[in-house]
């Protein structure tokens, strides 16, 4: 029998799914062998069909119901100021949570199984939690319990690096409401208390809130730290610091917040931006439905990024040397020096904590592109700092101090600050799955539940076992 060669596959005819944008940018080509390669197609973003139902959520101590036509967190997204934001959150804490058992099955229905998984458990959702946009019923209820968890911290002293707005602000509030004395640092000392004094319970904690008297810039930590240590010692006493939260970090440089393509967006409000998203096809690109999307109120006075593109969408060759150096100094060098100078000044007790705020960008086992490479490197360095200081937990043979407890926490995606107006008008962003209170709850979780040192990250209140 005559032997015939097997037919070779014509690689040019293979239906290749579109390559990564970054590969197109640098002009590289995939190398193929004689074996056909099948690329997994990108999933199209699909609008999930929801039942137009309205939920009646029972209000404790009242014969009334809270009527919801969308998950409650959308009301928090649109709160115009920190006072209203807190009041809306307190309403759930005080009026809804006591009767949580009565609303275990209160969910928004989906007509078909969603291709988008639950934010926590990653299983396909058939119903959406009454409070969260992207969580199933079980995970949503668990998240609410942790969101409103607390602990008696009277007599404890804490330092929150970067505590003026957003995540650091909410972390400081959680510690203050637990009874802790808190010092915050910020680069803007003159308006450091601008938002704290708008809180409805400000008078209850104002005597325990302190601001470091000088502007603190992580990029210049070496010059600032001796004075910070002295001020902490004068305020709390020698070796009386119990909690150190390393929150401040630079991701995007906003100093050059202008370019020659911004004219189209220069005078737009957030509401007008949202309207443009809808007009430019945002409905086809967004999840959840557009009618569940809300105007993201800028409660903290942050200026919208009016550039057509920023370094979040640039590769390392397009990013300025100054920004690369600034991000590395703030995230890596600044964090190392803070630990070096402040950990020796902490109380010698097992019930003391250092929390590094990690990020997904710093993990090695997730897909990476060439975008914001310098940020990824900086966040990975912070994760390595946690790993070295915390050790290998129970398998560690190196003798280490029993205090403080070292943790790294990934707070999750709760902000859209890194996206420019240009990206927002193209419908390329979504409602984040959680808000800054949820993110802060994740950060303080090891403190409130007195967890021992862990060398990797905490994600969604659980230990992450990969690096």
Curated annotation (Swiss-Prot):
Domain of life, per lineage: Viruses
InterPro entries: Fungal_SecMetab_SDRs, NAD(P)-bd_dom_sf, SDR_fam
Stored Pfam families: adh_short (PF00106)
SUPFAM superfamilies: NAD(P)-binding Rossmann-fold domains
GO MF annotation list: oxidoreductase activity
TM regions (residue ranges): none
Protein name stated in the entry: Uncharacterized protein R665
């Amino acid at each position: 029998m005559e032997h015939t060669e097997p037919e070779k596959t014509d690689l040019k005819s293979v239906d290749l799914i579109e390559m990564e944008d970054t590969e197109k940018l640098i002009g590289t080509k995939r190398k193929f062998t004689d074996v056909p390669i099948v690329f997994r197609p990108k999933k199209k973003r699909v609008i999930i069909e929801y039942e137009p139902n309205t939920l009646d959520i029972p209000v404790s101590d009242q014969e009334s119901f809270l009527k919801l036509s969308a998950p409650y967190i959308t009301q928090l997204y649109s709160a115009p100021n920190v006072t209203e934001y807190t009041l809306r959150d307190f309403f759930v804490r005080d009026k809804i949570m006591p009767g949580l058992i009565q609303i275990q099955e209160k969910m928004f229905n989906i007509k078909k199984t969603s291709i988008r998984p639950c934010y926590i458990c990653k299983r396909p959702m058939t119903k959406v939690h009454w409070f969260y946009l992207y969580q199933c019923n079980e995970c949503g209820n668990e998240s609410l319990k942790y969101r409103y968890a607390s602990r008696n911290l009277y007599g404890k002293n804490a330092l929150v690096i970067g505590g003026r707005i957003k995540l650091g602000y909410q972390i400081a509030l959680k510690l203050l409401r637990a009874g802790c004395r808190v010092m915050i640092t910020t680069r803007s000392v003159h308006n450091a208390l601008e938002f704290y004094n708008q809180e409805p319970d400000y008078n209850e904690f104002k005597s325990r809130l302190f601001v470091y008297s000088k502007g603190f810039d992580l990029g210049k930590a070496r010059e600032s730290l001796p004075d910070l240590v002295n001020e902490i010692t004068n305020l709390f006493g020698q070796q009386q610091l119990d909690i150190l939260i390393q929150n401040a970090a630079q991701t995007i440089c906003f100093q050059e917040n202008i370019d020659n393509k911004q004219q189209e967006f220069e005078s737009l409000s957030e509401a007008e931006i949202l309207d443009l998203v809808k007009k430019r096809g945002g409905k086809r690109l967004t999840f959840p439905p557009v009618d569940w999307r809300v105007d993201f109120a800028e409660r903290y006075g942050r200026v919208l990024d009016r550039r057509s593109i920023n370094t979040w969408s640039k590769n390392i060759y397009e990013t300025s040397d100054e920004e690369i150096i600034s991000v590395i100094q703030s995230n890596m060098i600044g964090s190392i020096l803070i630990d070096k100078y402040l950990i020796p000044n902490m109380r010698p007790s097992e019930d003391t904590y250092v929390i590094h705020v990690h990020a997904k960008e710093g993990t090695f086992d997730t897909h990476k592109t060439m975008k914001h490479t310098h940020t990824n490197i900086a966040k990975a360095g912070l994760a390595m700092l946690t790993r070295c200081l915390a050790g290998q937990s129970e398998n560690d043979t190196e003798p280490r101090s029993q205090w403080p407890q070292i943790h790294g926490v990934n707070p999750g995606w709760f902000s859209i600050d890194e996206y420019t107006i240009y990206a927002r008008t193209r419908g390329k962003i979504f409602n984040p799955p959680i808000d800054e209170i949820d993110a802060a709850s994740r950060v303080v979780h090891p403190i409130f539940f007195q967890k021992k040192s862990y060398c990797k990250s905490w994600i969604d209140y659980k230990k992450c076992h990969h690096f």
